[in-house]
Structure formats: C-alpha cells, structure tokens
C-alpha cells in the first residue's frame, strides 16, 4: 500500500470515529427552569394514525407519568367536559386555541400538546407488531413559550427475535397475532409504555421534576 493510500485510509477512519462519537442530543432547559410550571393541562392528542382510538387511548395514559414527575395534572374528565361545553370537540380545534386563553379558562401553568404519529397493529409477511409513536411539546400558557419537546416509541416486538417453527409457523403466528391485536386494541398498553418513555422525569432529555417531587430542583 502506498503512503498516500495509507494516509487516505487513516483519514477515513478518523472521520468515521468522529461521526461515531458525535455528541448525544441535548435539550435547552433555560426557559423551562425559568418558568418552573407547577400544573399541567393535557390537551387531547392530535392523531396522525388511521386508528380512531389513538387520541383517547393516549390521553388516558399520560396522567400517571406526569403525576409521578411531580406535577398537578388538570383532571382529564373535567377538561374534556369543559371543552365540549364550549363547542370544542376535535383536538385540532383545541390545539388551535391561544395559550393565554387556555390559561384564562383552566388556570394551568403549562399545556402539554401531544401528537400520536403511529398507533395500532400492522401485518407484514412474517411478523405482526403493535406500535405507538408520539411526540409532545410543553408550552408556557402565560407566554406561549415552548419549554420542552420530546418523542418516544414503543413496540410489541421489542426484544422478540424468535423464529421457531419455520416460515409457515411464523406466517400463522403473525396472522393470529394480527387478529387478536386488532380485536382487543393491543395499542392501549403499548401507548402506556410510550407515555412513560415520553413523559417520565429524570431522563437525559426528559421532563424536569415538578414541585411535588422530592427530587424537585435536583435536575
């Protein structure tokens, strides 16, 4: 190998190492720490999936991780009834309301805007999996400032690499799973996992601990 070729190879290896050692994603928490919201209003999630159950399935799952993180969460049923009483029945219309108006109506410090991007079971040639993917933004309802954004995904096939039974067995298993999953809304428990990953505090890019948590202010 010539000297020039060796230099080129070393250069490529150096670039590869630099790419592989790229800095992990970071989040700017300065506005979040300045606002320090105590209460959160969860808006009905926007649904970009074809499954109509996605909005309320996800909505019913988010209170727990938020409460565990140390926030007061406005009661979901009361919020839903208030929107309906005022003629607001679709997530798109609700998401379009000015943040200051939401603060005026509910008195919450921040609003959580969620979008469900994937929800439900998909059938492929030799597998069938249930996936829920969602993104979220936490917005200061007094100023309209975005305090935090995040996303998460969960799948029923995580860690499942078994292929016992051959091709025919895999096809039958996938078909049976598809029937069971679509008839029982298998997306609901997966949405719970997604919401935990999305909204649990203490993660590197997750929500900060709220004032009701003993870990408040440690992050």
Where are these regions (language model features)?
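Alpha-helix termination/capping residues and helix-transition junctions
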Residues: 15, 34, 105-108
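Bacterial N-terminal signal peptides that target proteins for export
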Residues: 1-10
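N-terminal segment of the mature soluble domain
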Residues: 49-113, 145, 149, 178-179, ...
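Solvent-exposed loop/turn segments at secondary-structure junctions
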Residues: 47-50, 79-83, 117-122, 153-157
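C-terminal motif of bacterial Sec signal peptides marking the signal peptidase cleavage site
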Residues: 17-20
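Post-signal peptide N-terminal segment of mature Sec-exported envelope proteins
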Residues: 30-53
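C-terminal/domain-edge helix-coil "capping" segments
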Residues: 22-38, 141-219
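Surface-exposed short loop/turn segments
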Residues: 91-147, 157-162, 166-169, 212-219
């Amino acid at each position: 190998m010539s000297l020039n070729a060796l230099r080129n190879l070393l250069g490529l290896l150096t670039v590869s190492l630099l790419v592989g050692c790229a800095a992990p994603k970071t989040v700017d928490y300065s506005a979040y720490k300045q606002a320090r919201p105590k209460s959160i209003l969860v808006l009905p999630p926007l649904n970009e999936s074809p499954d109509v159950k996605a909005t309320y399935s996800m909505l019913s799952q988010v209170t727990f991780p938020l409460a565990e993180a140390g926030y007061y969460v406005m009661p979901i049923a009361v919020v839903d009834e208030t929107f309906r009483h005022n003629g607001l029945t679709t997530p798109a219309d609700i998401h379009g309301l000015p943040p200051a108006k939401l603060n005026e109506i509910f008195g919450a410090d921040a609003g959580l805007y969620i979008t469900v991007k994937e929800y439900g079971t998909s059938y492929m040639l030799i597998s069938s999996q249930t996936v829920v993917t969602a993104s979220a933004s936490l917005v200061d309802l007094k100023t309209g400032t975005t305090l935090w954004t995040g996303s998460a995904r969960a799948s029923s096939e995580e860690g499942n690499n078994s292929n016992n039974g051959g091709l025919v067995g895999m096809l039958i298993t996938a078909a049976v799973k598809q029937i069971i999953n679509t008839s029982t809304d298998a997306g609901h428990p997966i949405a719970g996992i997604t919401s935990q990953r999305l909204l649990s505090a203490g993660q590197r890019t997750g929500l900060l601990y709220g004032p009701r948590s003993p870990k408040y202010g440690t992050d």
